[in-house]
Amino acid sequence: MVRKYETVVIVQPDLGDDELKGLNAKVTDIIATMKGDLHRLEDWGVRKLAYPINKSARGRYYYVRFDGDAALIAELERRLRLDDKVLRYQSVKIEKETAAPAAKVAPVETAPAAEAAE
């Protein structure tokens, strides 16, 4: 059964471009070989961590949004667990697609100039 997932991966902040491209290729290859559908792979950049992980105070965040089955998520997490460059990862099954609520604009009441002067 195909389900929707999103995964956030935190890697070491000092990786070079070749290593980052290799990590991106690894994730896309796993999803492709397990017959998944990759929707989004975003680099969120280097951010400060809430607490040090492996003596590192910063980490590079990646967001991956894909469709797949349970075998795909198990294989992806297994490969991420074995990679020394990955500090942490978290995969979540998306139950419902939620759209951002439209911002409500309250009408601004302006007092007439005559009333404001009194």
Curated annotation (Swiss-Prot):
What keywords is this UniProt entry annotated with? Ribonucleoprotein, Ribosomal protein, RNA-binding, rRNA-binding
Q: What Pfam families has UniProt attached to this entry?
A: Ribosomal_S6
- Signal peptide extent: none
Q: Does the keyword rRNA-binding apply?
A: yes
Compositionally biased intervals (Low complexity)? 99-118
Please provide the Gene Ontology terms (biological process) for this protein.
translation
Which Gene Ontology terms cover its molecular function? small ribosomal subunit rRNA binding; structural constituent of ribosome
Q: Does the keyword Ribosomal protein apply?
A: yes
Its GO CC terms are: cytosolic small ribosomal subunit
- What InterPro entries is this protein classified in? Ribosomal_bS6, Ribosomal_bS6_sf, Ribosomal_S6_plastid/chlpt, Transl_elong_EF1B/ribsomal_bS6
* Chain positions covered by the region annotation Disordered: 98-118
NCBIfam families on file: S6
Q: Which family does it belong to?
A: Belongs to the bacterial ribosomal protein bS6 family.
Role, per record: Binds together with bS18 to 16S ribosomal RNA.
- The molecule here is called Small ribosomal subunit protein bS6
Identify the species of origin. Answer: Geobacter metallireducens (strain ATCC 53774 / DSM 7210 / GS-15)
Q: Taxonomy-wise, where does this protein's organism fall, top ranks first?
A: Bacteria, Pseudomonadati, Thermodesulfobacteriota, Desulfuromonadia, Geobacterales
